[in-house]
């Protein structure tokens, strides 16, 4: 895979006009100087990109693991309470929906909503699936796998989200 390395002084013509952070997971959390004036801030410090660094570390990335005996989804939903989350299994898919109404924060008013959909492996026992939300905002959805000779049932059913008082340890790769 070829990666183009380009000095910040030679950005494409429309680069400064394209917003960098306005439509990511941090929408509504306040803007940095770079977000409002990307050309100006890059001339002051062409290598300073806090918003890019922050978005990599705190982007709400989900992790899906399918081990030999277990299927797990870990999703950062720190801005949502269990009441704001809906987790359903519909046939071979897990649908996770989060929505909270408009509320006031440090920067004004914010409302958030997301939808995630994941395909379940065919050998996951849907009747034994659990879902929990840790105190640090990690939603963990997991279910055991059954031997391939058993046929797991497929239907729609909601999965309750329980709250855990301990933070989830960082997922290891």
From Swiss-Prot:
Annotated region (Disordered), positions in chain: 142-173
Record-annotated sHSP domain positions: 52-162
A Pfam family of this chain: Crystallin
Subcellular location per the Swiss-Prot or TrEMBL entry: Cytoplasm; Nucleus
Residues involved in Zn(2+) 3 binding: 154
GO molecular function: identical protein binding; metal ion binding; structural constituent of eye lens; unfolded protein binding
InterPro entries: A-crystallin/Hsp20_dom (IPR002068), Alpha-crystallin/HSP_16 (IPR055269), Alpha-crystallin/sHSP_animal (IPR001436), Alpha-crystallin_N (IPR003090), HSP20-like_chaperone (IPR008978)
Glycosylation sites: 162
Keywords: Acetylation, Cytoplasm, Eye lens protein, Glycoprotein, Metal-binding, Nucleus, Zinc
Any one of the GO BP annotations: protein homooligomerization
GO CC entries: cytoplasm; extracellular exosome; nucleus
Entry keyword Cytoplasm: yes
Residue positions where N-acetylmethionine is found in the record: 1
Residue sites binding Zn(2+) 2 per the record: 107
Chain intervals with Basic and acidic residues compositional bias: 153-167
Predominant subcellular localization, coarse grouping: cytoplasm
Residues that coordinate or bind Zn(2+) 1: 100, 102
Role description: Contributes to the transparency and refractive index of the lens. May act as a chaperone, preventing aggregation of various proteins under a wide range of stress conditions.
Oligomeric and partner information: Heteropolymer composed of three CRYAA and one CRYAB subunits. Inter-subunit bridging via zinc ions enhances stability, which is crucial as there is no protein turn over in the lens. Can also form homodimers and homotetramers (dimers of dimers) which serve as the building blocks of homooligomers. Within homooligomers, the zinc-binding motif is created from residues of 3 different molecules. His-100 and Glu-102 from one molecule are ligands of the zinc ion, and His-107 and His-154 residues from additional molecules complete the site with tetrahedral coordination geometry.
PANTHER family according to UniProt: ALPHA-CRYSTALLIN A CHAIN (PTHR45640:SF14), HEAT SHOCK PROTEIN HSP-12.2-RELATED (PTHR45640)
Similarity remark: Belongs to the small heat shock protein (HSP20) family.
Entry protein name: Alpha-crystallin A chain
Organism: Gallus gallus
